[in-house]
Amino acid sequence: MTPTMKSIARRKALLIALSIFAVTFILWNGFPGSSNRPLPSSNDEFHYEDIELPSGYRSEGEVVDLLNPKDELEEPLFSEEPLFPVTTSIPTKTAVSKPKIAPTSAAKDVTFSSSIDSDDCSVAYDNSKPVRQYVLMIDAGSTGSRVHVYQFNNCNPSPKLEEEFFKMIEPGLSSFAGDPEGAAASLDPLLDYAMENVPEEYRRCSPIAVKATAGLRLTGESEAKAILKSVRQHLENDYPFPIVKDGVSILEGSMEGIYAWITINYLLGTLGGKATHSTVAVMDLGGASTQLVFEPRFASDGESLVDGDHKYVLDYNGEQYELYQHSHLGYGLKEARKLIHKFVLNNAEALKESLELLGDSTSIIHPCLHLNASLTHPDSKSEASEVVFVGPSLAHLSLQCRGIAEKALYKDKNCPVRPCSFNGVHQPKFTETFTDSPIYLISYFYDRMISLGMPSTFTIEDMKYLANSVCSGPTYWQDAFSLTDALKELKEEPEWCLDLNYMISLLSVGYEIPNNRQLHTAKKIDNKELGWCLGASLSMLSEQNNGWNCNVKEEI
């Protein structure tokens, strides 16, 4: 090797040595600008608060949400373009597994993750409760079932609803008559959805209830019991959620009204010791029944609500509410239609007037149908011919229809305890015991009026004007209703005139609400759905009436 070649080889060796030294130095002391912090071992705890964030990103003591920062930075924390080519593998969604579980320990052994805090607080008002809590309610209706997953925080004496997750499926439990196991399995999509939305460490202390409506009764008592038993066994064997006392059952109509009242007053902030406004009344119009719940206020200290099935004393968050409640079975919208049709049919047969024989059918003028409408009576008495109801040929301004609806209320029926509403049922008068607080109308009340462009606040006089417009027929609709959907609904539903006039009669004659009293209707408050489910879930969190314990189990 020549001297020149030896010199070149020595230079290469020196450069390699210097490179090795530089790499070793950097790895030992860290990159410029970084602290001399050893990497944590597998036994060290990692704390979010140890992460150094840019100045101004959070205030002292503020909980940092790394995924959803409250304030946007002037410049992104990371470059939008990767420094090096990155291949990302996106995992596909897999079904939620249902672990088989067996009880092993007491509820006191449950621990909750402190990393799952609320935006409102990091420590619960009551140390025995977690900051965040979940409640699951399955509403098993006749046509389908739906699950509500409610997320609460316990930052204050009363739980605060933070978020609601919702999913609906069809058909309902009653469609599985003769197949109880199939009925139970039909709820799996809802239960798996709940598993996805409740963090794993909270599932065993997240109570669940399955409440079927009266539609399940139509399958027969033994069939309904078999379905409910199978649903309960499925929950106990395949899911971690604790079941509340009487948690898998048919919901009584009276409790539907109570829970709906709790829901609306909770969302309006009129419940609890810090409430600054009086509670509101709630009227719920379903298909088979209608419920009324309100808190009467008597002028004299010596007066109070008389004892009876209508009286319900509610304990909520240390406050006691003495409520009037009643569920009028058979006076829901669909049942009221049948009742009014029966009145019209019987009246026509008795008088033999307005009867026209049209081949194999009998035509009867029906004052509760809009102008020139026709409707085949679904319960025609004669097997030889069907009954066709037809609307009047001249506008009648709804008065005749309301007269029939008022007769269906049996206002003059004997009433043992006065004052009374209708059909012999006791009820304190609104004009004496509930003079100025709001009245909320929900369910079919909302559906029938809002879809026609009615504002959310109105009077019975406004309802009468709307009913007159609807009953006047298609020629008048073009000028009265500008909404395309409203016109479509009116054309497809000949009983809309009947529905509105029945509602007017129910409110003004049945419940005796003054025509100029302001009424409110809504489907949601603060983007939370109205109805009985939220109220029932709040009841499940009540210390006095919870009827459940944490379901502390382990996988086997």
Swiss-Prot record:
One cellular component (GO) term of this entry: endoplasmic reticulum
Parts of the chain on the Cytoplasmic side: 1-12
Does the record bear Calcium in its keywords?
yes
User: What GO molecular function annotations does the UniProt record carry, in alphabetical order?
Assistant: GDP phosphatase activity; metal ion binding; ribonucleoside triphosphate phosphatase activity; UDP phosphatase activity
Q: In which pathway does it act?
A: Protein modification; protein glycosylation
Tell me its EC number(s), please. Answer: 3.6.1.42
Side Lumenal, residues:
34-556
Physiological role: After transfer of sugars to endogenous macromolecular acceptors, the enzyme converts nucleoside diphosphates to nucleoside monophosphates which in turn exit the Golgi lumen in a coupled antiporter reaction, allowing entry of additional nucleotide sugar from the cytosol.
Protein family according to the UniProt entry:
Belongs to the GDA1/CD39 NTPase family.
What protein name does the entry list? Answer: Guanosine-diphosphatase
Q: Which organism is it from?
A: Schizosaccharomyces pombe (strain 972 / ATCC 24843)
